[in-house]
């Protein structure tokens, strides 16, 4: 998978946090899902490739 500035929807019907879901979680995707229901990883973006400071992801990859 890519390691760059995602437009929001990385997977079909899934979002990696901020853009698609303001709460900062991705539904059924894993990255920052139920472990961060209100943007637990706010200011972090770990997509399995590296930490990004401009995303609301969980600071760790769940899947």
Swiss-Prot record:
UniProt-listed Pfam families: KRTAP
Superkingdom as given in the UniProt entry: Eukaryota
UniProt KW Repeat keyword: yes
Tissue expression profile of the protein: Is essentially restricted to only one vertical half of the hair forming compartment and in beard hairs is absent from the central medulla.
Cellular compartments per GO CC: cytosol; intermediate filament
Sorted UniProt keywords: Keratin, Repeat
Record InterPro entries: KRTAP8-1, KRTAP_type8/19/20/21/22
Region of interest: 12 X 2 AA repeats of G-[YCGS]: 12-54
Family of the protein in this entry: Belongs to the KRTAP type 8 family.
Oligomer status and interactors: Interacts with hair keratins.
Function: In the hair cortex, hair keratin intermediate filaments are embedded in an interfilamentous matrix, consisting of hair keratin-associated proteins (KRTAP), which are essential for the formation of a rigid and resistant hair shaft through their extensive disulfide bond cross-linking with abundant cysteine residues of hair keratins. The matrix proteins include the high-sulfur and high-glycine-tyrosine keratins.
Protein name: Keratin-associated protein 8-1
Species for this entry: Homo sapiens (Human)
Biological classification of the source: Eukaryota, Metazoa, Chordata, Craniata, Vertebrata
């Amino acid at each position: 998978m890519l390691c760059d500035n995602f437009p929001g929807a990385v997977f079909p019907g899934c979002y990696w946090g901020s853009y698609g879901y303001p709460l900062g979680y991705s539904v059924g995707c894993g990255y920052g899902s139920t472990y961060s229901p209100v943007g637990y990883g706010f200011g972090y973006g770990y997509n399995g490739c590296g930490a990004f400071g401009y995303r609301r992801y969980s600071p760790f990859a769940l899947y």
